[in-house]
Amino acid sequence: MKKILIGLAGIILLAFIAFYIATKPTETKEGTYIPSPLALKLATSPTTDFDNTIYKNPYTGNKKILMVSTEERNMTMANGKKFSTGNHPVEMLLPILHLKNAGFDVDVVTPTGKPVAIEMWAMPEDDENVKKIYAEFKHKLEKPGSLANFVTNSLKDSTDYAAIFFPGG
């Protein structure tokens, strides 16, 4: 009976250690943190539910969508550590897929024109549609326009845009 209890205690201890490791945020090589392996398993998916909707009457005009994205890569937490953040790839790229299928072009800006920060840890690696639109938009995401310049120079007289899109993150 004593050996059984010791064995059971060992199994419980290993389970607690595994749970602790799985729930601890992961430090990146840059010294920032991303969600724990358990959080990533529970809150992200390797695919999306994008169904490649075909719109019967896609937009055929010249107006575009202006996507305003974040360029902020890190958020300082209460303990002083930095959490890697940015635009969530699914919350940004799935709407772009739908907008493109609906007939719209999308322009990309960030507050100062620095590259769009993307939470790459949340990228659905097995989703071909998301990977394709990411590759298509990579240049725009790396070299976006500046929202500050847009507001100063173009906003007052701009009739180029049908909507402004603020993706989540």
Segments (PLM) and residue ranges:
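Extended, subdomain-level signal for the structured scaffold at the beginning of enzyme domains
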Residues: 3-169
